[in-house]
Amino acid sequence: MVTVRALLLALAVSLFTAQPESSRPSFAEFLAGVRAEALSRGIREAVLDEALADIGEPSAVVIERDRTQAEAVLPLEKYVDQRLMPRQIAAGREMLARHHDLLEEIGAAYGVPPALIVGILGLESNFGRFSGVRPTIAALATLAWDPRRSALFRRELFAALEILNRGDIEFPKLRGSWAGAMGQVQFIPSSYLKFAVDYDGDGRRDIWATPADVFASIANYMQGHGWAADATWGREVKISGNAKRRIANEVERRDGTCQARRDMTTGLPVERWRALGVRTLNGQRLPPATPNAALVSGRSRSFLVYQNYDALLEYNCAHSYAIAAGLLADRIGARQAPRGEPTQQIPKAPQPPQAPRTRGQQAAEKPSLK
């Protein structure tokens, strides 16, 4: 009997093979072109022999997953509820307590709240428990050949080959998600090359198994995308039907490179949101706030979000993801925080120094005892 999954896989195959064959090379020809370009970029032949040898056909499963991402398919409210289950909040609090000193140190160095670091890790890999088993090179090769986002994934394929060429990880261990996201932090290869941190100073940026490198890499990514240490991400709010109509008529939508950025309003002063009828969840006036706030609305829940929300969208440009990350951090970092209260209840990390030092750098600066 034909299963639903088999039908989905057949549909996925048809989606990326429907275009005329004359418009693109066969998969084998594509891989040959990748090999030639990689050699011209300085990737060692031995690396390519190992990385490309066993890739026979493009993966229909990978294409299927690319068409049905949870953040894009599930309504915001359902996605958030699934990722804020009590067991996930408890697991986050346990990790926060177990690595308290290390997380406080990294939070202070990068200006990112420890609870946010842990919350992102919870969404990305269930607090490090699962980071994917799919061979990264094969997944990226499929997506680079598929025309939907070919240019993006072609860049990521060469970045992954560069990681192997540098010896950061052995090829058999280079596994991750269907989209080529790697390690507990689920960095795509280009993000790894730019933001991964060797915090423990052992010579490897190990986002797969070393807690210090994992936490610092997340913090470095958030800092690098504009997370401000002295600010919050946002808060849940209450909006009446009349207020929603006024907002739709009077407030402009934002421009942006991804759909999520276009599905939110421009930033307005809190006083303006008050005048439009936006209230706290318990119906009170919004408290004073210095930064402008934008409005993000799902089917039944709405949020005022600040500048730091943009940093969350940089990790994954979907409102369901960014809202879930912020709320999960709130729950992990503040046991008694009621639903919708902002991350002001989470102790702020101090302003980061100009150039955070890894533990290896710190050790090198200590006077020798010999």
Please identify what each model-predicted range represents.
Residues 55-58, 124-128, 181, 299-301, ...:
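Solvent-exposed loop/turn segments at secondary-structure junctions
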Residues 48-73, 121-125, 135-138, 236-245:
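Acidic helix-start/capping segments at beta-turn-to-alpha-helix junctions
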Residues 77-219, 223, 233:
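Acidic/His-rich structured neighborhood in mature extracellular/periplasmic domains
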Residues 171, 175-297:
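Flexible, glycine-rich surface segments
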Residues 21-107:
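An acidic, Gly/Ser/Thr/Pro-rich helix-cap/linker signature
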Residues 2-10:
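Sec-dependent signal peptide recognition
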Residues 9-20:
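Hydrophobic h-region of N-terminal signal peptides that target proteins for export
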Residues 240-370:
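C-terminal soluble interaction/assembly domains
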